[in-house]
Amino acid sequence: MATSAEELREQVRARYAQSARAVAGEGDGCGCGSGACCEGDTDGAGFGEALYAAEQRDELPDAAVLASLGCGNPTAVAQLHEGETVLDLGSGGGIDVILSARRVGSTGTAYGLDMTDEMLALARQNARDAGVTNVHFLKGLIEQIPLPADSVDVVISNCVINLSTDKAAVLAEIGRVLRPGGRLGVSDIVAEDRLTAGERAERGSYVGCIAGALAKAEYEAGLEAAGFEQVTVEFTHRVADGMHGAIVKAVKTPTPAAKGLPVVQPAARAGCC
């Protein structure tokens, strides 16, 4: 019997709640090693805290590092600047939000969005321990981002979009909240185009970040359909046969004015009124 989208979401939520409780000393880990989002033949390699530079890990609370479940380091490729507003989708224990908050400085803001209460509580404590105050953690779904349109300069995410059961909605929401010309910098698991959906599922489970991964061409087409340009998907490391950690980058199509092009105004209507 096929698993429904809601059932998959609950499996993901339960898995990450368990991981948060383990970091907080309240339960067992997910069984995949140090914070790894792993299953199948991945054995945890290419996931977790080891993907961050030692100097980054050293400046973070231990719990933020231990709670890292990602497959990359999106803050390293997002090219954040002081004063920017950045949003992390599926922010988990807050590692990328804390790093982003320091990059954008006191005049910038870093948002973290997560659906799991246990992860949100852990992230808020980690932010307090890190001494960052320009952060806000929001509860919600990445398919329904609780922020206004055109309110964010940069969206990042770390091994989370593959877990969504409605990736088109996620990409559309990213396009909605980004300002024109805003940037996307994501680490995710991406499949080679040669693999069918069934072959991806053979390599690992949905909650293990494998079965739900998009193929490279699917990711590129999805972003272009959502109004992005300068789309690139670059494989960085193998996590299973035909499956890779990848850096996904794109820019929300700027308005004509932002591109330096003339804005054509509608012609005045003839008549007396």
Which stretches of residues belong to each language-model region?
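Core SAM-dependent methyltransferase catalytic element
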Residues: 226-229, 235-272
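A short glycine-rich, Lys/Arg-flanked "PGG" loop and its adjoining helix->strand segment in the class I
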Residues: 168-183
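Short alpha-helix
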Residues: 211-226
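Conserved alpha-helix/loop element of class I SAM-dependent methyltransferases that forms part
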Residues: 30, 36, 41-85, 96-99, ...
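Short, glycine-/aromatic-enriched active-site segment of Class I SAM-dependent methyltransferases
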Residues: 191-210
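Short conserved loop adjoining the S-adenosyl-L-methionine
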Residues: 144-149, 165
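Class I SAM-dependent methyltransferase SAM/SAH-binding core
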Residues: 66, 71-74, 81-144, 169
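Hydrophobic beta-strand segment of the Class I
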Residues: 86, 155-156
